[in-house]
């Protein structure tokens, strides 16, 4: 049994290691990385233009920043800018492409290094929509500086605030004694047993038995409950029902998640269920539906807001126009008192009307929530959240409900040593270990063909997850196997046409599975030999396997041909191509965009990393594992949770591309290869 305080003290040390490591990485990155690499990493916009400015409903001075002309190879880059992220503006001595530009770490007043000049102020992202970003500014002078700048850009800044908030939350939990926070700390550590209410179970005919059990367990729990939702088991449906039922007993609940996207998803489902939601912070997807329940939109839609806006404007005008010796302090003070009075009244009404307050875990430290306490906190996607972030929200609640799957994507951690020593262990995992009676596993999945699901169920969930009859035998083509493994190195007689970009016919070279014949496409590598060995790309040793990528593309094209173009488009079958390696996904995405044979299907083909597909599903999934070497090195493919996510995105067809000789050194991949071979022989 763990001592709860000692555990959290150790956790704080690990968080400090992560903080130090990430801050140093940011410093090195800023000093040594050129603009193009920053852009391709998704951490920089350049060039940009400062557009219109205004005061938003929170009385923050903001400016719209628009991304100007960018190169073709930048079109598919997924940027990392989102609400709440700190950013720093810079200008360059010469336009992009005319100088070799390295960075300069922004400290103090506009340091200059190798053509970079950083502005001395930092800003925060308010929201992002396509090529337009709205960021806060400290003053109108900052705007003038930006408008006068040439070759303007901005990049992500080190996120000091989030770390400070997590440290503060951990300190509160560590020092908690003889209060509710102290009780929860001891319960999570297994030092106290969680209590339950007793009342007759409620029937939910529209849920399955384990979903119904999970909702009842949430209602019975006095302290903590975990809803463990494997892929396709309806975790979100169950969680929404649990929140809805809880609101029959409580006035208001707090709903949090690690990411803005996850908060958006659960918020949207609750709104669809008729629940009044107040979203603190701006959504990751900017549309009218998502914005309609944000605090900022509701605030500025309030009938008293025009008066508040007018008072704020008057105060600014008085300050700007006053002359030396003018005594306007009393007038400004009276106006500020009236503005505060209106603002507090609007706040009170917005919170009174909301049944659910939704925000990220870090966002729960927002000053709007300072005086608010909640009977129940729901944390969605809890297995992706660092435990220190969870404590930020836990401080505001009397009981905690966590939902997620610790066999899927883990939290993102930069410091390997901190991860190895335990920072990667989530609060959800701790509770599952220390309080197994407070965990309900959802056991029926509604997504995958049974053959796709079964290996995942056996390896990750002790065989407890089963397929609903409605999906058990779903398939794209009759009499085909739903799961397939293709190894390019087993294709021993590549045609000379591979070197020139041609294709060989199915008769010349095929990989057979049942009656599904898959031709091998062009390698496009320009090498003298058709080589499926992985290659290193870039300063971070990103990995790419172009021959395997070409095999993926030709396999997909052949499979679409077997289905038939008319049927494929009429039924809107969708395809996901997944690779754990970002460079591989970029190459695949570029090829699909360039090649005419994919033009009719581009709208239904998605290419992304495993992280980019979390929570999604497709009819057809192709996975490119990339790794192929003589040493059996597989890198982070050994994090099996990522492979679990990748495989379980498929509804009807799963095709895995990988070098068996490299991968079968690992027990998981050896078993998976054997499983696929066994199905092939049936």
Where are these regions (language model features)?
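Motif I (Walker A/P-loop) of helicase-class P-loop NTPases
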Residues: 236-244
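Conserved P-loop NTPase motor core of helicases/translocases
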Residues: 198-199, 244, 252, 264-371, ...
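Conserved helicase motor core of SF1/SF2 NTP-dependent helicases
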Residues: 249-251, 259, 348, 362-493, ...
């Amino acid at each position: 049994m763990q001592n709860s305080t000692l555990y959290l003290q150790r956790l704080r040390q690990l968080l400090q290691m992560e903080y130090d490591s990430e801050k140093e990485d940011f410093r090195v990155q800023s000093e040594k990385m050129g603009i193009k690499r920053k852009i391709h990493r998704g951490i920089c916009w350049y060039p940009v233009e400062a557009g219109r400015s205004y005061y938003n409903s929170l009385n923050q001075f903001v400016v719209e920043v628009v991304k100007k002309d960018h190169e073709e190879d930048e079109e598919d880059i997924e940027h990392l800018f989102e609400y709440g992220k700190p950013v720093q503006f810079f200008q360059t001595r010469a336009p992009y492409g005319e100088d070799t530009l390295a960075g300069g770490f922004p400290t103090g007043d506009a340091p200059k290094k190798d053509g970079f000049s950083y502005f001395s102020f930092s800003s925060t992202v308010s929201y992002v929509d396509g090529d337009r970003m709205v960021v806060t500014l400290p003053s109108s002078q900052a705007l003038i500086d930006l408008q006068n700048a040439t070759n303007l850009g901005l990049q992500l800044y080190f996120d000091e605030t989030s770390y400070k908030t997590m440290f503060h939350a951990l300190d509160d939990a560590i020092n908690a004694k003889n209060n509710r926070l102290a009780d929860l700390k001891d319960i999570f550590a297994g030092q106290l047993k969680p209590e339950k209410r007793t009342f007759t179970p409620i029937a939910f005919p529209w849920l399955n038995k384990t979903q119904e059990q999970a909702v009842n367990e949430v209602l019975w729990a006095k302290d903590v409950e975990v809803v463990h939702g494997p892929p396709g088991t309806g975790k979100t449906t169950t969680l929404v029902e649990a929140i809805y039922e809880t609101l029959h007993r409580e006035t208001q609940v707090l709903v949090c998640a690690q990411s803005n996207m996850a908060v958006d998803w659960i918020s949207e489902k609750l709104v669809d269920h008729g629940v009044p939601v107040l979203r603190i912070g701006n959504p990751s997807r900017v549309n009218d539906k998502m914005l309609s329940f944000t605090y900022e939109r509701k605030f500025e839609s309030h009938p008293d807001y025009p008066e508040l806006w007018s008072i704020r404007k008057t105060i600014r005008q008085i300050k700007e126009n006053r002359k030396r010796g003018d005594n306007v302090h009393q007038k400004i003070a009276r106006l500020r008192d009236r503005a505060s009075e209106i603002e507090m009244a609007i706040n009170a009404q917005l919170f009174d009307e909301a049944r659910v307050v939704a925000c990220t875990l870090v966002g729960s430290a927002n000053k709007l929530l300072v005086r608010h306490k909640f009977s129940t906190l729901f944390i969605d996607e809890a297995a992706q959240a660092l435990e220190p972030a969870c404590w930020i929200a836990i401080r505001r609640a009397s009981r905690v409900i966590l939902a997620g799957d610790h066999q899927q994507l883990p939290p993102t951690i930069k410091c390997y040593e901190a991860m190895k020593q335990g920072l990667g262990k989530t609060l959800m995992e701790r509770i599952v270990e220390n309080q197994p009676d407070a965990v309900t596993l959802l056991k029926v999945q509604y997504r995958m063909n049974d053959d796709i699901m079964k290996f995942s169920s056996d390896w990750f969930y002790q065989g407890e997850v089963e397929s609903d009859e409605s999906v058990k035998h779903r398939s794209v083509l009759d009499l085909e196997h739903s799961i397939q493994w293709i190894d390019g190195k087993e294709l021993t007689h590549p045609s000379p046409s591979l070197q020139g970009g041609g294709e060989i016919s199915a008769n010349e070279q095929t990989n057979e599975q049942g009656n599904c014949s898959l031709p091998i496409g062009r390698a496009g590598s320009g090498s003298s030999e058709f080589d499926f060995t992985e290659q290193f790309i870039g300063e971070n040793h990103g990995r790419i396997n172009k021959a395997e990528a070409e095999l993926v593309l030709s396999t997909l094209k052949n499979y679409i041909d077997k289905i038939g173009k008319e049927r494929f488009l009429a039924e809107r079958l969708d395809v996901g191509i997944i690779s754990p390696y970002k460079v591989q996904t970029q190459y695949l995405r570029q090829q699909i965009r360039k090649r005419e044979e994919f033009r009719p299907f581009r709208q239904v083909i998605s290419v992304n990393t495993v992280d980019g597909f979390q929570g999604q599903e497709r009819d057809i999934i192709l996975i490119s594992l990339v790794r192929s070497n003589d040493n059996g090195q597989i890198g982070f493919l050994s994090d099996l949770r990522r492979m679990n996510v990748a495989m379980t995105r498929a509804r009807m067809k799963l095709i895995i591309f990988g070098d068996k000789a490299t991968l079968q050194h690992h027990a998981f991949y050896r078993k998976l290869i054997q499983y696929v071979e066994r199905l092939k022989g049936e």
